[in-house]
C-alpha cells in the first residue's frame, strides 16, 4: 500500500489533518480566486459588468458542483479501498475520472452554447446586462471540461494522502488567471482590450493549464496511482457508485446555485445595483467559505480510510478535531470581515450606491459562517461512511429547504434587508438540524459497536474484479 495512504490510518491526527488541510485550503482558495480576480478587474468596466458576472455565477457553481461531487465520490471510494488494502480496486476507481470529466464538461459547454439566453433569463438577468452575461457564460463554459477535470483529479490524488499536488494544480491555474486578467480585460501592451470577454478567456486558458498539470501527474507516474488502459475504460457500475456517493456534495453545491438563482430573482426587482451588490458580497464571502471546503476535502479521505479499516475511534476523533478547528478559524475570519467590510467591498467597486448596498450584505451574510463549517464537515462525514441518503438530506436542507423559503418570507416582511438577514437565520437553523443528525449517528455507532463489526457496503463493491 502506498505510504501516503497508510498515514491516513496511522499518523497523529492533528498533524495529519493539518498536513492535508493546508494544501487543500490553499487549493480551494485558489479556485475561488478565479471569480474574485475577474470581479476585481471587471469592476473597472462598471457596475453592469459586475452584475453580469453575478448573474452567471450560479451556472458556474453548478459546474463546480458536479466536479466537487464527482471528486467526492471518487475520493470516498478510493480512500476506502486503500483502507481495505485493495490497491487494484483503488486504481480502477481512479481511472474513471477521465471519462466522467469529459462527459460532464462537454454537457455544460453544450448547454451554455445552445441555450444561453433562456439560461440567463432563468438566472434573473436584466435587459441591460444580458449581452455581457451571454458572452461571459459562453466563453467560460469552454473551459468546463478542464475545470471539472481539475476538481475530480485533485480529489483523486488527495484520496491517496497527497494534498500538495492538487494544490499545485489549483494555484498554478489561479496565478496564471491573475496574470492574464489585466492584459486581456484592459488591453495592456500588445493585447487588445477585450473587456468581459477577456476575463472569460483568461479563466479558460488558466483552467486548461491546470488540467494539463493534472494529466501530467496522473499519467506521468507522479502519484500513488498506477492507472492502466483497462482502468480508464468506462465501468457503468463503478460510475454509478461514484455518482451515488458523490451526489450529496453535488447537491450541496447545486442547491447553493439554485438558492442564488432565487436570490437573484428576488434582488432583480431592486435593479442592477442590488445584483452588483450581492455579486460583490457573495464573491468576498465565497473566498472566506473556501477554507471550509478545503478542510472537508481533507476530512473525507480520513473518514473513508478509517471506515474501511474499521477504526471507529480514530474516525470520530478526526471529525471532532476538524469541526473545532474550522469553527475557530471561521470565527476569527468573521471578525475581520465585520470590521473591514467597507474596505473589502471597496476593492471591487467605487460606485457609492453599490458600496452602500454591498457592505451590509457582506456583514450580515458573514455573521454565521462559523455555523456553516460544521454542517459541511458533517456532510463529508456521512459521505465517507457511505451514508449517501443522509448526506443528501443535509445538503438539501442547508440551502434549499430552509434558505429559499426564508429569503422570500423575510424580503416580503422587511425588504432588501430582510433578504440579507435570511442568510444567517437559515445557517443557524441548519446547524441545529445537522448537529442532531451527526450526534444521533455517533451515539448509535457507539452503542452498536459498528466500528468493530462493520461489513463493507455491498452496493459499493462493483469496482472489485470478479
PLM region descriptions:
Residues 1-21, 78-145, 191-247, 303-368, ...:
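Short alpha-helical transmembrane segments in multi-pass integral membrane proteins
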Residues 8-40, 44-45, 58-73, 77, ...:
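N-terminal transmembrane alpha-helices
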Residues 19-38, 139, 173, 206-210, ...:
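Transmembrane helical elements of multi-pass membrane transporters/channels
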Residues 29, 33-51, 120-127, 183-194, ...:
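Helix-terminus/linker motif at the lipid-water interface of multi-pass membrane proteins
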Residues 50-110, 147-166, 277-335, 339-341, ...:
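Small-residue-rich hydrophobic transmembrane alpha-helices
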Residues 62-65, 177-182, 211-215, 287-290, ...:
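Hydrophobic transmembrane alpha-helices of multi-pass small-molecule transporters
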Residues 71, 140-158, 166-174, 199-213, ...:
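Short runs within selected transmembrane alpha-helices of multi-pass transporters and secretion channels
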Residues 112, 155, 181, 185, ...:
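Structural signal for membrane-spanning alpha-helices in multi-pass inner-membrane proteins
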Amino acid at each position: 500500500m502506498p505510504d501516503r495512504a497508510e498515514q491516513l490510518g496511522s499518523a497523529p491526527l492533528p498533524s495529519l489533518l493539518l498536513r492535508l488541510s493546508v494544501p487543500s485550503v490553499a487549493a480551494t482558495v485558489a479556485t475561488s480566486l478565479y471569480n474574485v480576480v475577474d470581479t476585481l478587474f471587471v469592476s473597472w468596466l462598471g457596475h453592469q459588468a459586475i452584475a453580469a458576472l453575478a448573474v452567471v455565477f450560479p451556472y458556474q457553481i453548478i459546474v463546480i458542483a458536479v466536479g466537487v461531487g464527482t471528486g467526492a465520490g471518487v475520493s470516498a471510494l478510493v480512500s476506502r479501498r486503500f483502507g481495505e488494502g485493495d490497491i487494484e480496486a483503488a486504481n480502477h476507481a481512479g481511472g474513471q475520472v477521465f471519462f466522467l470529466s469529459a462527459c460532464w464538461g462537454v454537457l455544460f459547454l453544450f448547454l451554455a452554447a445552445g441555450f444561453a439566453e433562456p439560461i440567463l433569463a432563468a438566472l434573473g438577468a436584466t435587459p441591460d446586462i444580458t449581452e455581457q452575461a451571454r458572452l461571459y457564460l459562453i466563453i467560460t463554459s469552454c473551459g468546463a471540461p478542464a475545470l471539472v477535470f481539475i476538481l475530480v483529479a485533485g480529489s483523486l490524488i488527495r484520496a491517496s494522502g497527497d494534498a500538495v499536488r492538487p494544490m499545485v494544480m489549483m494555484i498554478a491555474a489561479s496565478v496564471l488567471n491573475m496574470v492574464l486578467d489585466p492584459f486581456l480585460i484592459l488591453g495592456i501592451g500588445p493585447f487588445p482590450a477585450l473587456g468581459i470577454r477577456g476575463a472569460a478567456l483568461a479563466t479558460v486558458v488558466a483552467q486548461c493549464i491546470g488540467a494539463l498539470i493534472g494529466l501530467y501527474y496522473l499519467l506521468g507516474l507522479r502519484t500513488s496511482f498506477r492507472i492502466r488502459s483497462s482502468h480508464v475504460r468506462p465501468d457503468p457500475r463503478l460510475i454509478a457508485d461514484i455518482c451515488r456517493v458523490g451526489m450529496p456534495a453535488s447537491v450541496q453545491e447545486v442547491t447553493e446555485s439554485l438558492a442564488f438563482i432565487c436570490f437573484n430573482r428576488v434582488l432583480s426587482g431592486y435593479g442592477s445595483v442590488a445584483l452588483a451588490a450581492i455579486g460583490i458580497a457573495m464573491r468576498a464571502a465565497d473566498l472566506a467559505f473556501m477554507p471550509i471546503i478545503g478542510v472537508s476535502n481533507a476530512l473525507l479521505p480520513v473518514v473513508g480510510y478509517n471506515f474501511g479499516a474499521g477504526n471507529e475511534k480514530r474516525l470520530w476523533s478526526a471529525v471532532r478535531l476538524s469541526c473545532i478547528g474550522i469553527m475557530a478559524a471561521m470565527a476569527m475570519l468573521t471578525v475581520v470581515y465585520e470590521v473591514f467590510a467597507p474596505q473589502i467591498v471597496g476593492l471591487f467597486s467605487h460606485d457609492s450606491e453599490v458600496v452602500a448596498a454591498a457592505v451590509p450584505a457582506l456583514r450580515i451574510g458573514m455573521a454565521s459562517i462559523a455555523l456553516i463549517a460544521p454542517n459541511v464537515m458533517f456532510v463529508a462525514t456521512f459521505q465517507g461512511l457511505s451514508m449517501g441518503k443522509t448526506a443528501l438530506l443535509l445538503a438539501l436542507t442547508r440551502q434549499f429547504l430552509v434558505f429559499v423559503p426564508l429569503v422570500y418570507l423575510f424580503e416580503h416582511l422587511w425588504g432588501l434587508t430582510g433578504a440579507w438577514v435570511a442568510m444567517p437565520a437559515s445557517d443557524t437553523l441548519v446547524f441545529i438540524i445537522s448537529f442532531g443528525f451527526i450526534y444521533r449517528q455517533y451515539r448509535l455507532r457507539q452503542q452498536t459497536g459498528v466500528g468493530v463489526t462493520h461489513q463493507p457496503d455491498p452496493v459499493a463493491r462493483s469496482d472489485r474484479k470478479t
